[in-house]
């Protein structure tokens, strides 16, 4: 049976895709068969008449995953807006049935599956015939989560608000990862200390422009759960 984790963040452009790629890369470098999936992607590039799922393409390149990155994403939109709005603009009905079908197809190819969210944790995926929020996807696949947060000013507030929402939705958070961390920045140091001291969740860091995570592989493996 495969094991999975969901990667979400405290907001947009926090570094979810970057961290997701480094996690998968770390596992694959130790011969762990880890794959990637994303339900909906906005802001895709168009090349030679074809939309390119940029996030998936980045992850595949960094983590050395073979195959077409577009196959790892159920819905790909060019407009850089929330998935529900992109679907409206393109007259597309987003279906949980398709998301489930694609997810299980990817899951069956790997021993570990890393699922990346869209934007922050409160993200409408569909407001059409089916009302789908990001947390619905996390819960239907029974995935635990990693929360990616920026290491800088304001992260205590945004991280705790994100965790409170996830607690209300009964989503298990296994790790907080502070991105763009600078070991000489007093704000970053204090944010890590405060969150570590006041939350019952492990807090790790990822240095800015790092090409690998310093988190032990054993710790990463522990947070993936059977799905």
From Swiss-Prot:
Gene Ontology terms for molecular function: ATP binding; dethiobiotin synthase activity; magnesium ion binding
InterPro entries: DTB_synth_BioD (IPR004472), P-loop_NTPase (IPR027417)
Gene Ontology terms: biological process: biotin biosynthetic process
Biological pathway: Cofactor biosynthesis; biotin biosynthesis; biotin from 7,8-diaminononanoate: step 1/2
UniProt keyword terms in alphabetical order: ATP-binding, Biotin biosynthesis, Cytoplasm, Ligase, Magnesium, Metal-binding, Nucleotide-binding
Active site (record annotation): 38
Binding of ATP, residues: 13-18, 55, 116-119, 179-180
Localization, UniProt: Cytoplasm
CC cofactor: Mg(2+)
Binding-site residues, substrate: 42
EC code(s) of this entry: 6.3.3.3
Functional note: Catalyzes a mechanistically unusual reaction, the ATP-dependent insertion of CO2 between the N7 and N8 nitrogen atoms of 7,8-diaminopelargonic acid (DAPA, also called 7,8-diammoniononanoate) to form a ureido ring.
NCBIfam families: bioD
Assembly and binders: Homodimer.
Family to which this protein belongs: Belongs to the dethiobiotin synthetase family.
Protein name per the record: ATP-dependent dethiobiotin synthetase BioD
Protein encoded by which gene: bioD
């Amino acid at each position: 049976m495969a094991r999975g984790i969901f990667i979400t963040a405290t907001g947009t452009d926090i570094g979810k895709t970057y961290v997701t790629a480094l996690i998968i890369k770390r596992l694959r470098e130790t011969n762990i068969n880890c794959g990637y999936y994303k339900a909906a992607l906005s802001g895709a590039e168009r090349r030679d008449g074809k939309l390119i799922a940029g996030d998936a393409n980045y992850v595949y390149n960094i983590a050395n995953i073979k195959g077409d990155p577009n196959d790892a994403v159920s819905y790909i939109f060019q407009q850089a807006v929330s998935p529900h709005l992109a679907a409206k603009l393109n007259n597309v009905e987003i279906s949980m049935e398709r998301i489930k079908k694609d997810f299980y197809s990817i899951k069956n190819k790997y021993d570990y599956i890393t699922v990346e969210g869209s934007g922050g944790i409160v993200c409408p995926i569909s407001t059409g015939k089916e009302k789908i929020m990001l947390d619905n996807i996390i819960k239907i696949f029974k995935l635990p989560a990693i929360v990616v947060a920026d290491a800088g000013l304001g992260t205590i507030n945004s991280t705790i608000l994100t965790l409170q929402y996830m607690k209300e939705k009964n989503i298990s958070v296994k790790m907080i990862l502070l991105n763009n961390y600078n070991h000489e920045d007093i704000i970053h140091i204090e944010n890590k200390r405060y969150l570590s001291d006041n939350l019952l969740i492990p807090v790790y860091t990822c240095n800015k422009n790092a090409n690998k995570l310093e988190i032990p592989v054993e710790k990463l493996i522990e947070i993936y759960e059977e799905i």
